């Protein structure tokens, strides 16, 4: 990969001597996004936060980094070892909090706050604005007492269970290992 010491020389040499080799894949590699999620991530390039990311067989509680190409950071690099093209990944943006419960509780104690006012305790402002544009744009100017409990539950659930399908990985160019 891009560290300078790695090359395909060993594999080429093994093939010349008819030695068996295993197929290689880029590993510990950032994931790319397309469409609206590419634009979303690109606008947030440099924003990082602790998350829990998973595929059905494995998950990691580490930092996630939004990049101009998609997603990176320790959680995504680890997950890339288990993810397969076309599969969805799940991202819990606040793994230590049930955000539906947080929003419903805040509605009782601070009914004049907005969704972003409550969630600003957990997320950077830029991320909150981007999430709002995707998931609750019609509620941007609403206070909690104006929002139905079911809507708050859905928003909280989305934040704890964001599912998306990466378009690929950055491949061998940025892979840490093969």
Model-derived regions: residue spans:
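Generic low-polarity alpha-helical segments
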Residues: 1, 14, 93-97, 103, ...
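Short, flexible micro-motifs
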Residues: 1, 7-8, 73-76
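Short hydrophobic core segments
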Residues: 1-5, 13-15, 64-69
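Glycine-rich beta-alpha-beta "Rossmann" dinucleotide-binding loop(s) and their flanking helix/strand
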Residues: 5-25
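An anion/pyrophosphate-binding glycine-rich loop and adjacent beta-alpha core
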Residues: 19-25, 29-150
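A glycine-rich dinucleotide-binding beta-alpha-beta segment and adjacent secondary-structure elements
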Residues: 133-178
């Amino acid at each position: 990969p891009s560290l300078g010491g790695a090359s395909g020389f060993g594999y080429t040499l093994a093939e010349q001597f008819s030695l068996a080799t295993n197929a290689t894949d880029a590993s510990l590699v950032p994931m790319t996004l397309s469409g609206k999620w590419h634009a979303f991530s690109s606008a947030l390039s440099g924003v990082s936060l602790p998350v829990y990311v998973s595929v059905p067989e494995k998950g990691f509680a580490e930092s996630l980094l939004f990049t101009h190409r998609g997603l990176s950071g320790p959680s995504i690099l680890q997950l890339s070892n288990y993810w397969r093209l076309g599969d969805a990944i799940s991202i819990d943006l606040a793994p230590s909090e049930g955000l539906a419960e947080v929003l419903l509780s805040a509605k009782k104690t601070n009914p004049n706050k907005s969704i972003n006012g409550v969630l600003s305790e957990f997320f950077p402002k830029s991320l909150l604005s981007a999430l709002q544009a995707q998931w609750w744009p019609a509620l941007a100017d609403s206070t909690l007492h104006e929002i139905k409990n079911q809507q708050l539950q859905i928003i909280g659930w989305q934040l704890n269970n964001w599912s998306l399908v990466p378009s690929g990985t950055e491949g061998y160019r940025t892979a840490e290992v093969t």
